[in-house]
Amino acid sequence: MLQQDIEIVNKLGLHARASAKLTQMAGQFASEIWIERNERRVNAKSIMGVMMLAANKGSTIHLEIDGADENEAMQALAALIADRFGEGE
């Protein structure tokens, strides 16, 4: 199992489009992927769950990934978040 804290750096935080990109990417992996913020833990493959986290810019989320492709999943999701979900700001 891998765990990592990641800061949300894009201007609008985990809004609908960013949440959709995250859940779409998470769905490509067989591993179980969980995101936690403020003691709320949600399945990263659920767009409604991810949006309910209401993670704004500067928020820290905790990623927990467990499964055969956990390393690849962690690298891909961390890169997506660091790249501001491809939004450029």
Regions found by a protein language model. Name each.
Residues 1-5, 60:
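Intrinsic-disorder/low-complexity, polar/charged segments enriched in Ser/Thr/Lys/Arg/Asp/Glu/Gln
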Residues 7-57, 65-66, 88:
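Compact, glycine-rich, soluble single-domain proteins
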Residues 56-89:
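C-terminal structural segments of small proteins and small subunits
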